[in-house]
Amino acid sequence: MALLQISEPGLSAAPHQRRLAAGIDLGTTNSLVATVRSGQAETLPDHEGRHLLPSVVHYQQQGHTVGYAARDNAAQDTTNTISSVKRMMGRSLADIQARYPHLPYRFKASVNGLPMIDTAAGLLNPVRVSADILKALAARASESLSGELDGVVITVPAYFDDAQRQGTKDAARLAGLHVLRLLNEPTAAAIAYGLDSGKEGVIAVYDLGGGTFDISILRLSRGVFEVLATGGDSALGGDDFDHLLADYIREQAGIADRSDNRVQRELLDAAIAAKIALSDADTVRVNVAGWQGEITREQFNDLISALVKRTLLACRRALKDAGVDPQDVLEVVMVGGSTRVPLVRERVGEFFGRTPLTAIDPDKVVAIGAAIQADILVGNKPDSEMLLLDVIPLSLGLETMGGLVEKVIPRNTTIPVARAQDFTTFKDGQTAMSIHVMQGERELVQDCRSLARFALRGIPPLPAGGAHIRVTFQVDADGLLSVTAMEKSTGVEASIQVKPSYGLTDGEIASMIKDSMSFAEQDVKARMLAEQKVEAARVLESLTGALTADAALLSAAERQCIDDAAAHLSAVAQGDDVDAIEQAIKNVDKQTQEFAARRMDQSVRRALKGHSVDEV
């Protein structure tokens, strides 16, 4: 019996008719395409039997090449040969230049600050470059399957934010592909291993690719895949190993000039070749730019040790989020070509206390999982009992009075998901409300990330708290967020789809979760203070309105007592003593109780005036 079966409109396969679907691993260094044939998932090779496609595009005035042919031109035509474009996806030009100062490309900024790469083929953005890689993969699949693809599942790092995910979908559309779903890379690996081995329990997926690192803690049970927690670093991968080794070789060779792009490429190529060789050998000879020398595995390990340690710190945070200890993990799945590095396997094994799984080629496992998922989503497996539950990496919420963040969807909530929460107006006669969408784990707006702002207008002018606005957050299966605000009595509404202009910085990604734990006690105190200050402001504003309307109900002595209490509250509300503010609010409440009762009596008498008892 199927646990969950959702068919895309128009994609229900007719009996005995298989639809053509593919899984695409759009990687930083290499990309792959896979499909399911005769019940088996397999990656598709090119004419020369090569399964990997280098994620490199070489642009010329009359066209472009993708893959190995493009990579071969890198040393001779560096500025027109674009590689590792995935690292630029969803980032601003300023962010890219600060993060990767040695990139050899000619950048120009568009109107909104996004990067444009000046090539022989004209100005191109990262979405266009990614689209050209996707086109090459789709063409390989169509030729191998003898038909056009009906749909694809494309994998992305678990830490990709809205802008990076949207950029990936835009690239697919530009390539003419129908995206069935974006799938987190570690989750795709879990699908591949979960179906093959049938393991049940907690599994860690350690994914170290060319440009990104992801760690996911999953629970597999009776065909249900649930992501308990995710973590990682969107700017850490095997490319960083390569650059560290290239810099070391440069120092050993005495090459001081960094402006020669051809030499830069030779150094990088030599570093990559040495890294690969050191996975099997203890020593490798290097010949570059007229220099010859030896690099040992021990030297390489010393260079990358700090980076490997960073990945293990992320593993520890993810385990804490999932509420499990390293010894609770049954299996550790290794994903990504960089997990072939012996030091990585050794340190990961020591951390989890078990030998990592490498049965499926770590370069291919993500594409294989994506192909299995695509085969299901396209309608070829209507009786599949696999249910996939992804999670959002950071909490989503709204700014409320006092600069506070009210979380609507907590982090690690499974997606797709929709959550609604009701809010009220703060002032009498308020006819509009500013909606400020936030992302993060801290209690104050200043410590979280702003995602979007929009306004709801047309709220009926009622007393403070009289209008009720329902705000709905909806996160789709690809992790993209839309927010809708609706005034319940009139039905007036406004909405926005959150598409940030560029992605989170490394500092934001790495520190937001860590800071939420480090500053937990401080944040709670700050929130309590802010809440009391907001309540004080509300009480004083309400009291001012009441006194303006009905001061005649008070004697001079009563009015003086209320004014004194209000003045004291106004004074202490400027300070940081939560208890003092709370006591001052209670004092105002005590001094105004009789006044409130008289106002209520007066309102009742006015309402009953001219009516008989029978009418009441």
Curated annotation (Swiss-Prot):
Coiled-coil portions: none
Gene Ontology terms: biological process: iron-sulfur cluster assembly
Entries under SUPFAM superfamilies matching the protein: Actin-like ATPase domain, Heat shock protein 70kD (HSP70), C-terminal subdomain, Heat shock protein 70kD (HSP70), peptide-binding domain
Assigned keywords, A-Z: ATP-binding, Chaperone, Nucleotide-binding
One Gene Ontology MF term: ATP hydrolysis activity
Domain of life (superkingdom): Bacteria
Any Pfam family matching the protein: HSP70
Family per record: Belongs to the heat shock protein 70 family.
Protein role: Chaperone involved in the maturation of iron-sulfur cluster-containing proteins. Has a low intrinsic ATPase activity which is markedly stimulated by HscB. Involved in the maturation of IscU.
Protein name: Chaperone protein HscA
Species, as recorded: Salmonella paratyphi B (strain ATCC BAA-1250 / SPB7)
